[in-house]
Amino acid sequence: AFVSKNPSKSLIFKRISFSQNNEKFMPPTGTPFSYHEIQLVQWWIQEGANYAGSLNEFSVTPEIQTLLLKQYGLDTREKPWVEKVNLDPLPPSAVIALEKANFSMRTLSQNNPLLDLRYQGEKLSKQALTLMETYAPYITWLNLSNCKLTNSDLKTIAKLENLTRLNLQQNSIRTNDLAPLNTLSHLEVLNLHSTLVNQDVFEILKSIPSLKKVFLWNTKVSLNAVLKNKPAFPSTELIIAL
């Protein structure tokens, strides 16, 4: 009835695609397949025609993704990391401790305990670093702008396994200081505005393939350097002031 991965040689696909006037048209009676249903059959055969397979096992093209969502309410888009993490709510004692250590915070939503955390002190304290490490799984957005960060501080930040956004602007950090961040496999946004990073930063950024956006204005990185390196970052937006 079908040839795996070859719709054009599959009898079932041929017959549902025939004109209704053709004596071999399927189904011979009842409602014919819609255009969208024919598309799905074609895609299913191309993917190997596995009866027992789930959608997660198939390569869903953007066209099929849109069709499944609009026609059947099936959302096959990959969920962002923050929606995949499953944690119990942060205990009140932790919230109090973080606030006493000069952090302001909010959860991403009522049902998502991951934290958007901002340090409001002049210099990141040892107490703050200890608390960040203690509650590392909860921290996904972190703003450490203008708080006199050191190389050692960045080694602690590299332990925040669920970090997706990191703001390091207005700190005297250099390119090599960022090397530990290659452990942050879910980091999507990195703000390096007004830091001391130079054009060597692109080698560091290559080691963080999850990045989608990097802010580089008011650094030692030139526009020419950004344009030269942009082909190496097809999925990353490199932002620099003109």
For every predicted segment, state its role.
Residues 132-133, 157, 178-181, 205, ...:
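Hydrophobic anchor residues at the C-terminal helix/turn of individual leucine-rich repeat
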Residues 26, 128, 149-153, 173-177, ...:
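The leucine-rich repeat
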Residues 77-172:
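LRR N-terminal entry segment and analogous cap-like coil->beta motifs
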Residues 139, 163, 187, 211, ...:
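Conserved hydrophobic position(s) of the canonical leucine-rich repeat
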